[in-house]
Amino acid sequence: MDEREKILQAQNLTVSFRTNEGMVRAVRGIDFDLYKGETLAIVGESGSGKSVTARSLMGILAPNAVVDAGSILYEGVDLLKLKEDQFHKYRGNKLGMIFQDPLSSLNPIMKIGKQLTESMLLNEKISKKDAKERALKLLAGVGISDPERRFNQYPFELSGGMRQRVVIAIALSANPEILICDEPTTALDVTIQAQILELINAIKEERRLSVIFITHDMGVVANMADRIAVMYAGKIVEYGTADEIFYQPAHPYTWALLASIPDLDTKEKLESIPGTPPNMLFPPKGDAFAPRNAYAMAIDFEEEPPLFQLSPTHYAATWLLHPNAPKVEPPKIVTERIKRMRTLGGEA
């Protein structure tokens, strides 16, 4: 039994979108928990449902979204049942979010200072002077030099990395307990990416935050996540501790993601995942990954696999784990990478 304190719990979360062509089944009955002080990474390709999951948590789904089923429990309250005016108590104050593109996350015609202090002045009994003082501390706290000057600048006057630091400061301005990071480094170059990841880790430790980190890149979460949920076609197909996912991956899709991580220490050819994700207007029968899976069996095209338990913390939805399935090893590139990580003593 896990004795850590659970801060958030999603149960059977199911989200669709109305379109002219029909209903797009974006998230299909997922379950996950978030514990106090941990980082949970949700990893998957574009269209896997990971960002829709993040927006469901924040109550900021598009107008054509439909929550078909499920619950999101925070401190015993089902966030999905709240009206918009009730959600204000939680959005920002309890749950903060860092978005993918810092430029589109900021108002281009509003000064940085106003964007930082706006929610403070609206939601708290605080003077403009105190709000500015807190904003300057936030800017300094996220590594922005000369915060007084930046306070009076517009977003276009800052670099991409600087803008993302401002977005992080805004997300922290109401002292949330949970920080949701939706691909926060995708729009940045590699050097700046590393700095932002380091900053998020430092803020998490300093503020004792719980973090949900959304990404398509397994390499990004290697040194960040405590646990990882791998999503494909709106479902969680593997779920475990970071060590379990990196050292004992069980789902062929997880193998494919690990094989596609660039490795600068070897001359291995960069692997790609064949085919494309399914059209979720017409969710496939059986295992959604089967058409792209070199290890697929006949049953994969007919029946959806359940989550098989490998350990108290590790689950994977693949028929390869059925007792009657043939024994299959991960591809050579994955097993060699695991051996290398173990030899180097690398922590996932």
What are these regions (language model features)?
Residues 67-78:
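Conserved ABC transporter NBD signature motif
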Residues 173-177:
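A short, proline-enriched helix->beta-strand linker immediately N-terminal to the Walker B motif
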Residues 45, 59-60, 180-184, 188, ...:
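P-loop NTP-binding/switch modules centered on Walker-like glycine-rich loops
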Residues 4-6, 145-148, 241-345:
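Short catalytic/signature loops enriched in Gly
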Residues 3-7, 16-29, 60-66, 83-86, ...:
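A short, flexible loop at the N-terminus of ABC-type nucleotide-binding domains that lies
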Residues 78, 130-149, 258:
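Conserved ABC ATPase "signature" region
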Residues 79-96, 122, 244-249, 279-284:
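ABC ATPase NBD coupling module
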